[in-house]
Amino acid sequence: MVSNQQQSSENIRTWLDALASAFAPAETGLIRRACELAGPLYEGQIELTGAPLLQHALGAAEILAGMHMDHETIAATILHAAPEYLDDWAERLEKDFGAQVKMLVEGISRMEQIRQFSEI
């Protein structure tokens, strides 16, 4: 029997393989590394919609890939919740993924803070 985690990993590999035709190997590698970080980081976390956080992040990334967004935007989408789960997220993302991905995640985080503030 295949576990949900094994099935999820296989689905991610299949999706990444499909991306290889649209991106250079280094770009696909950046997206793959984002998935590798997000997998354990988001494990067991649930979105407000009730969906697993990783599933939500990958679904959003898949939509953006279909819109021909760049690899850094796709990686940032996958890592959008990192500030909630990593104390040193800014330094880590900049070191591992570059300044652009870090800035995009920071922007997503700020938009979420604004959304939460507006609900008060």
Task: Give the ranges of each region predicted by the language model.
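Active-site helical microenvironments for divalent-metal-assisted chemistry
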Residues: 1-120
